[in-house]
Amino acid sequence: MFTLKKSMLLLLFLGTISLTLCEEERDANEEEENGGEVKEEEKRFIGPLISALASLFKG
């Protein structure tokens, strides 16, 4: 059971890193297309991430 939780946590972590890298690349491409304009976006990712991790460790 513990190894399953570790595996799930590892997959979540790697998915988060992958998603972050894709978002950065997409933002760079959009900035290039818009002539250097930068859009401000409010990101609310940490709240759901913390609740998911808490539910994972409650078990």
UniProtKB/Swiss-Prot annotation:
Signal peptide interval: 1-22
Gene Ontology cellular component terms for the protein in this record: extracellular region
Organism: Rana dybowskii (Dybovsky's frog)
Major subcellular location class: secreted
Gene Ontology biological process terms in this record: defense response to Gram-positive bacterium
Keyword DNA repair found: no
Known function: Antimicrobial peptide.
Family, per entry: Belongs to the frog skin active peptide (FSAP) family. Temporin subfamily.
Protein name as catalogued: Temporin-CDYd
Keywords (A to Z) from UniProt: Amphibian defense peptide, Antibiotic, Antimicrobial, Cleavage on pair of basic residues, Secreted, Signal
Expressing tissues: Expressed by the skin glands.
Residues that make up the propeptide removed upon maturation: 23-42
Compartments, as annotated in UniProt: Secreted
